[in-house]
Amino acid sequence: MNAGADAVYMGGKAFGARQYASNFDREEMQKAVYFAHMHRVRLYITVNTLVDDSELGELADYLLFLSNVGIDGIIVQDLGVIRLARQIVPDLPLHASTQMTVTNSEGVKLAAEAGMERVVLARELSLEEINTICHGTDTEIEVFIHGALCVCYSGQCLMSSLIGGRSGNRGRCAQPCRLPYKLVNEAGEDLLSGKDAGQYLLSPKDLNTLDILPQLIEAGVTSYKIEGRMKRPEYVAVVVDAYRRAIDSYLGGDYQVPEEDFANIEQIFNRDFTTAYLLERPGREMMSDRRPNNRGVLVGRVVKLDKAANKATLKLDKELHLDDGLEFWGQRGWSCWHYCDITFWQNGQEVAVAAAGFAGHYRCAAWH
């Protein structure tokens, strides 16, 4: 909220698609509603898993609580949840989750007829398709503009159930797409051996739309969604702040994104970035096959490495401080990780901060 969000979505202890997050109990939710509304921010709750018959009684009680506590709306996937909500809490606004896989204007119309005030479109649509949908309906349209992507269609995945024994459609995704795999033929031979390919064949890059945000605004999108659950508060604050300022600069008639904002977003977390389906680039360009987690930012190069002396000669492009984390990569595929807990040396003197342009030595406890 402090970073400029107009609305926040979060999950409760049940029926949300992030069951391994800490989430909010009912008392915490009441406090969150009060806090959000005090700051004139809307608060939406995810009720976006598939629901069993045995859970309908619990769900009905939960929906009544959400309505009574003053939630501004719920995000839903299951058709049964929609019907039940319309019956017992008809005034509670409903938003169609991206997992409802709405991909065209007729789907938006059907969702509206079912009582949806807003539709979160499938993440696989292009800018042109989003434009067509927005101009063909009066229903509010929401799209994801930043965050993790799923290798399966709008998150509808059975891999987690088959490989990890945990259902991604029930909020318990084990993220098997972030694991290493090999592509082999019938003889078991690695088809990608020796080629320019990493091990993480199913791991997508992160979505980043700062470069094309004006086009999304001009397409008529109502709401811009940033994926942030199970992310650190610092990540959410940095990303929301950057997009808030970007949107405001567009509305002010002069769209600019400072290089500092690009750098901050890249540094806080990235698997490398892509515009993916929005610019119709769904192939290898959107995959992060070399690593499935935060890759950090390039800060410089190793000019010389002396493993015996635990010393590296560095040429830095960015400033480094003590306690920064460094990951070293070799041309032959090896890598190692260090925290900057040993000082830098420049011209025979210890320095606590290595500025951009630094050319000197970095010592660590051991290389491995």
What are these regions (language model features)?
Residues 1, 7-9, 14, 39-46, ...:
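Surface-exposed amphipathic alpha-helical tracts and adjacent flexible/coil segments at the periphery
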Residues 14-105:
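Active-site beta->alpha loop and helix N-cap motifs at the rims of alpha/beta catalytic domains
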